[in-house]
Amino acid sequence: MKVSLPAFEKAKVLVVGDVMLDRYWVGPTGRISPEAPVPVVKINQVEDRPGGAANVALNIATLGGQVQLAGLVGEDDTAKALTLGVQALGVEPQWLNIADKPTITKLRVLSRNQQLIRLDFEESFDKQDSARLLKQSEALLDSVDVVVLSDYAKGAIDNPRDFIALARSKGVKVLVDPKGSDFSRYHGASLITPNMSEFEAVVGAVTSEADLLEKARGLLNKYQFDAILVTRSEKGMTLVTANAPELHIPTVAREVYDVTGAGDTVISALATSLAAGAELAQACAIANTAAGVVVGKLGTSTVSRIELIEALALHHGESGFGVVSEDQLAYALEQAKLRGERVVMTNGCFDILHAGHVSYLKQAKALGDRLIVAVNDDASVKRLKGEGRPVNQVDRRMAVLAGLASVDWVVPFSEDTPQRIIARLLPDLLVKGGDYKVEDIAGGAEVISAGGQVQVLGFEDGISTTAIIQNIMAKQ
């Protein structure tokens, strides 16, 4: 299945649920305590990250979605730290402060990228607190397309059935990250996303794939869910709906360092994708890819749009790693520049990739951190090179280029010159191979006007696509 990202900036999502602060104490350990057989950790780093429903909201914001966040907190310094954490990414929280309860905090002690212990500071909120939170959140339903209920069984989501019914009556999809063995509380939800242990806590042990599907469909019928997405760790995800065949999506994680917050990432990517107009199967594939990225990070983390673009290109793209649309590339460049990366760009037909091309692209990449290759599409090559060209279709040309270690992104263009796309992307450095003069290079004036540079690189003598084609024809 070809997977592309929808316009996340159009997504409007409300997250309601158990917010918490994930606090990390980090340091080296080199000895055992004389008081007890436990390691001594010398703390040299303290970090606070929004967790639970707050992490869901931050994931949505990081992807580019518009998000509102509602949750229960205490009247303490932890609540202030949590507020600052979400505001840092542009999320304005709608807290309900409960004076006699602490803001939920999970403190983790880490050494050498390993979690040694977790300490929880919490008291469950009362039912009336949850009722007030859900009532307060009703006023926000008219301004969103999707609601996420992030339930960690801490009291914020006690009995949301009326809230779900109201949201659905307004045409708002309701996604639930469930907790506990009573799924009747989520009756009528659009989609629930239990992991395998949460699923089995409700339906009992799953003995086979057929058994999983039968039990999932039983829940659909019993609680009037539109769909169930069971996340299955190394086995990927299984989507079950009432009126379509099941969909199994294999895992895409390459390395797993920490599963903290992986469920948050799944439901946030689902919500953002659906709110942006994606079909359910597409949204699930995006969420699966996002989860594969986040488990490769340590601690509660988010996934950026550029990370998702690259991971999708690697795992789902039909043209190989690095092949992106112009819009995807424009966003990727914004992120690259925010990270302080120097972006180099070149262009060409690259009809038959040869040693001269490879050497040239390697030189170009050495001049910066990222290399973009803009490729003439088939119609453009035919106009420039004549009948019989291109030898290779644009998808194949881009796939070969994307396989080179020196190339980060490959993007097609349809005009005879790349002036328009260069003027839009404005790399830090525009390079061209051959005997061009800088003032004659398409797009060069625009790059220089924007403060960038233009440079001419040499090609290896005696190697060209035309010469290769002529040599092949002479031997026939």
Curated annotation (Swiss-Prot):
Keyword DNA damage listed: no
InterPro entries per record: Bifunc_HldE, Carboh/pur_kinase_PfkB_CS, Cyt_trans-like, PfkB_dom, RfaE_dom_I, RfaE_dom_II, Ribokinase-like, Rossmann-like_a/b/a_fold
Gene3D superfamilies for the chain: 3.40.1190.20, HUPs
Keyword terms: ATP-binding, Carbohydrate metabolism, Kinase, Multifunctional enzyme, Nucleotide-binding, Nucleotidyltransferase, Transferase
Enzyme Commission number: 2.7.1.167, 2.7.7.70
Gene Ontology MF, one: phosphotransferase activity, alcohol group as acceptor
Pathway: Nucleotide-sugar biosynthesis; ADP-L-glycero-beta-D-manno-heptose biosynthesis; ADP-L-glycero-beta-D-manno-heptose from D-glycero-beta-D-manno-heptose 7-phosphate: step 1/4; Nucleotide-sugar biosynthesis; ADP-L-glycero-beta-D-manno-heptose biosynthesis; ADP-L-glycero-beta-D-manno-heptose from D-glycero-beta-D-manno-heptose 7-phosphate: step 3/4
Assembly behavior: Homodimer.
Reactions catalysed, as given in the entry: D-glycero-beta-D-manno-heptose 7-phosphate + ATP = D-glycero-beta-D-manno-heptose 1,7-bisphosphate + ADP + H(+); D-glycero-beta-D-manno-heptose 1-phosphate + ATP + H(+) = ADP-D-glycero-beta-D-manno-heptose + diphosphate
Record's protein name: Bifunctional protein HldE
Gene it is expressed from: hldE
Naturally occurring in which organism (per UniProt): Shewanella oneidensis (strain ATCC 700550 / JCM 31522 / CIP 106686 / LMG 19005 / NCIMB 14063 / MR-1)
Matching SUPFAM superfamilies: Nucleotidylyl transferase (SSF52374), Ribokinase-like (SSF53613)
Keyword Transmembrane: no
Role this protein plays: Catalyzes the ADP transfer from ATP to D-glycero-beta-D-manno-heptose 1-phosphate, yielding ADP-D-glycero-beta-D-manno-heptose.
Listed GO CC annotations: cytosol
Residues spanning the membrane: none
